[in-house]
Amino acid sequence: MVQELERTRAKSPFPETAPAAYPVFYRTYSRRHEGGRREAWQDVCDRTLKGLVELGKLTNAERDLVSKMQRDLKAMPSGRWLWVGGTEWSKSPKNFSGAYNCTSTNVVDWKAFGLMMDLAMMGCGTGAVLEPKYINQLPTIRNKITVKMRGMVGMTIESQRREEAEIKVDAANNRVEIIAGDSRQGWVKSYQTLLELSTDERFDGEVEAIVDLSDIRPAGERLKGFGGMANPVKLPTLYQRCADILNNAIGRQLNSIECCLLIDEAAACVVAGNIRRSAGMRQFDSNDTVATGAKENLWQQDEAGNWRIDPTRDALRMANHTRVFHEKPSKEDVLTAVQKQFQSGEGAIQWAGEAERRAQGKGRYGLNPCGEIIGQDFHCNLAEIHLNQISPKDEQAQDDAFKAGAIAVAALLNHQFVEARYQNSREEDPIVGVSFTGFFDFCVKAFGVEWLQWFEQGRPDTMKGLEFKAKEEAFLSRWKKVVHETVWDYCDRHNIRRPNRCTTVQPAGTKSLLTGASSGWHPPKAQRFIRRITFRKDDPVALACIAYGYSVIPSQSDKDENGNLLDDPFDPRCTEWLVELPVEVDWANLPGADEVKIEKFTALAQFDFYMQVQKHYTAHNTSATVELREHEVEPLANRIYEAIENDEGYISAALLARFDDVQTFPRLPFEPITKTEYEDMLTAVRERRTTENFHAALEKHDAGELVEAGPAGCDSDKCLMPEKKPS
């Protein structure tokens, strides 16, 4: 029996065209059992399915369909559900939010700040709407806060730690003790209490806040329920940084960027190793001049000419910023936004009118961090269909996959949130999202190399081109219909209000790696490329990758005393590793496919493909990153303006300058390679490989919880590109 189990485990559940599947799965979705063994893919399928069946009261037929589609890698529940679904932790109402990819919150009170820290600590992406009509409901700042730290993290022995925060108020002496608790809620209460002190009328304009972190467990200690390890490394500086922001606003209300900084300072505390684990979206009114330039000149030069980040605004990098237009933007507004995004990746705009039209309600234009969900004070749970695993000729398999995804998201509508604003939103406007990934791969298989060549030509409206577009539309509209019918049928049978929009496309950067799909609707970087994934040095998963034959190099951040990149991953100065994975898309060897230059696809061609998805499949919004070169800025701006002006369905999209110069940006997450280079790398991997069983290789090195346990708040591979520093 044991031998049979080992044989099952040794057989890879992931396709050969997905070399990143093993490292991503074991780093991101595999939990450690109490007995010490780490979950294999089938274990995760068992756990998450059990949780869905229990929560969603699924029929046997629904259970069997969801199970088959997940095990066949055709339809998967959300990344958050893959991590926490079916655990005892996930069944407690205070932890329900941990099962959701993302949220949006209107910032109207101090509690909103605490809620967003709580959400970030559970792995949720946090959207915050920071328009005047919301933040002007916050009280005027009246008290100057002086912070004194008492006690070091980890001082109290485990058996004597407080779990809940304790607040001792001495109003007569204008003094408050904030004893942070060793729990998520304990962190949140200590943070929210400090903010509330700034407007507390029990004090006469000045208050001393004594913050005690003695009861907080030290870095590296296991988080038993959620999984992973504690990392309070940035918590001690949070309170003074927040006090500085609040003290700067005495006598007035906070402006939008001060609110943003308070949220982002808390988000910055949610880290694993030195890697960001939170993701955010901050929405500002289009007329908010303070917000418009908030990220400009973040880099500053010191007297020696060295560039550094402005420390008072560093936390702004934790989130994407979007300007919300409630009236259609002018052509000049759009051009300026496209120019700014090309230069810095920032400056995105959102047309709220289309969001409210789709959502069928005023104020329902709040966005999650990657911009694919629209609503107000919402939670969203996303399932994902892997189209690269499904034959374009097999309509039944397509329908089954989209039905399974719809059932998986509908099941979570049974959650009753503790927080009233989120529960009210769910009752009035329930939110689900069924996304897909690998649509580009699917189209290549459906329409052949001729479709690829037509894409390379710019997707012109020739007779053949119009035929291709009609076929794309037919697939997209049918899938949309299947999803909505399935969700609505489930809701009707369970007496749940029907969501009025159920389809979206997320960035799909992480789960796509499990099957080797080109993320979301996007084209791949190339037919063949090196995919580099960051790990801390000596990470057990990275060590297993070495045993499996993959090469490891130092990261871009590891340099010698002269500023040169290190070459030896075992150099004592090296702190992070890049595992290098040779990748070939599964259609790369179709006759003629190699000759198509994917990196030359125009911005307008990408935008045209994206709008096909936005018009014919997506009911929420389509997360999009259109890559462009400088000469494409004006034509793309004109096209976006037209799409808004003509009510074509456009809401928002991200734009990214193409990174063509590998020398300027060495060791990129994606580096195109030739077929010969790919085959040479693959041969070298096989020669170095000492085991065919990745799970067994990991068990040899895996002595405890991984630092980076569970998916991060953002699922986009676009966030991996290097930040442009001033030259």
Model regions and ranges:
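Extended catalytic cores of very large enzyme megasubunits
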Residues: 1-727
